[in-house]
């Protein structure tokens, strides 16, 4: 290393010691600093804010150093081999106390026949007496010499006495060895060396134009590959078959199991490389250094599964680090500290540097959060109040709702809100609206020959606009009351339908509110029931409901006060009753109690106190408007309320917009606000098939929800959703993805075998129906060639079989007696897309439960391993 840049070596068995060598060898001890700003002791260097290095010893007795290697065993602990410019290898030490064994080795020299530069040294990690040296080319000598350091002094004529270098001390104890244990690599230069850890007799050498693996058990043979990347060969300590080497600005990664070509080539900067080194504490992390650079480039080789037989390069994540501002002469990884290295500059300035680990974050579909940093794996857990926030996350809600089959009840549609937890008023309003729409659309379609049922799904906004010009006004008196004042009501067929959608009316022309009010009383909605009774001119029933609500165990005492106030109602404008009710209204918290007084104290046609009470349910406000507003007032109010619902994304507004484009706009605002693509998908599928389902937004919500179910591994739930979707929207039924055709004539077997031609695309048609009345198709209907045989039972495909090849014939008869429209899954055709072998699905499943290879003899295809999802199981039954 004389006249060259310094290099660093860590002690193999002392993680706090390292050597820096150039023209001399310096041994340092690294330790933690007392404090960042403390003064340094004499002979100490600050490497970082946390560490300092103290000089322990210096050895300047070995000039013309070109390479250094540290003895791999613990004893002797500070024995080093130094390769010199004349090809000699000298054993030396760093001023430590030595036992007799070490004293016999120190100063020992290993001299080649012909002098030339020693480029590299490598101790055998298993048999530590073997030391390999790589020399420059000589036409009459070998370039790879393996010395046995335990060899005795055997002087030869070829080594003149005056040329033998003696180490300091008694010359009688010094020795020179000139006979190497092995000589390899004739007529070529050796640039780098390393022993292969898997076998102590294998040596990898980077020669001038090739990489060669020498087996010391048979030195006449070698494995080699031609390449220019012969410098700096180094074995990955975590993967002994992976080797790195370099040439100029390129790094080659080799797999010794397939040594014909590099598995990966890394192109560096235009400047030539000076060093590459594998990280000893991290798998697949390679560091490289270029000449005259202050940057160390890191290559993180990711281990990703690839299909069998694919020759794909490993995924590489590249990054650069800058340990210091000056040019870096060399670096060395710390042998035990994670991602830690020491770098040295040409002027011997050193720095202790830690490469901060990339944090890999993983957020599972079930909201579990984990991340990896260094050798640690962390999991984020919720404690205390945090768990409630997780429960409120929409993803958690959608997952729980999917488990409860939310949205799939198409008969009693209103029950879906109960499957969602019955804790969201907007969802309750939505599903009741969809229930009423379905109910009355079917009722209208049965009574009329036209397509008026679709008007129901268009919403109340469209319904009320169609009633313009047909509305009649009536003056009605209070029911069961002596009041003389009349109230103006508006009525039409369309307004009646709107009241039905709001839930205020039932089927037929009967206007009896009794059942509806009774249901509200059962749910404890006393205030709402009383208000609706009052709006329908039944003040006596309203008072009775309030008194009944006040008498219950959890009744509100304000109900009695309101009931007493209602009993004194008078239509005189300047009465004391109106003045007191206006004051009382401001003191009430319940919106329905407030609107009752607002209604009674309002002028005819001026009901803003009721219509714009935002705490009141939208369906009740709309129903009230349909009763008491004329056509122009109703149209303006519905338009204004619809726009408010669309902007807020309030699901109660579906009553107004229906499942139209306005409804899609409203749902879009709702999804933007909540992320609930589940409700959006089921909602838009409820309506009769229309162009709305072709809207890109609707399709996006549906596909997003399907992807969510797949991510949760709810494959059965996703299949149920697809079936539900195809029933409500037949146009969404996908076309066949696979069909069976004859190898001889090319005609589709599925079309010919199907009893219903237009159903021939279904995959289930590839089996045999369970009905005993159907024919068995064991040959192609087109050319009469026999169908392939099952690889296990050897029966032609098309024959019904039992679930296992060894089952009795009686089992087959029992199976055939079951009348089904589609073939059982066990009878379906199935085959490997790689080797094309297959058979009955039931037999294949049974075989691959215990085997990984194809059941066909002489076929080594790993059929089951080709399916990356084969080992995954559904998670429908796993609670979050």
Swiss-Prot record:
A GO CC term assigned to this protein in UniProt: lysosomal membrane
Binding-site residues for Zn(2+) 3, renumbered to this chain: 832, 835, 863
InterPro entries registered for this protein in UniProt: MIOS/Sea4, MIOS_a-sol, WD40/YVTN_repeat-like_dom_sf, WD40_repeat_dom_sf, WD40_rpt, Zn_ribbon_mio
A molecular-function term among this protein's GO annotations: zinc ion binding
Major localisation: membrane
Record-listed Zn(2+) 4 binding positions: 835, 837, 854, 859
Gene3D superfamilies: YVTN repeat-like/Quinoprotein amine dehydrogenase
WD repeats: 60-102, 113-157, 185-224, 226-264, 268-309, 399-441
Top-level taxon in the UniProt lineage: Eukaryota
Protein family according to the UniProt entry: Belongs to the WD repeat mio family.
PANTHER family recorded: GATOR COMPLEX PROTEIN MIOS (PTHR16453:SF9), WD40 DOMAIN-CONTAINING PROTEIN MIO FAMILY MEMBER (PTHR16453)
Protein name per the record: GATOR2 complex protein MIOS-B
Gene source species: Xenopus laevis
Lineage: Eukaryota, Metazoa, Chordata, Craniata, Vertebrata
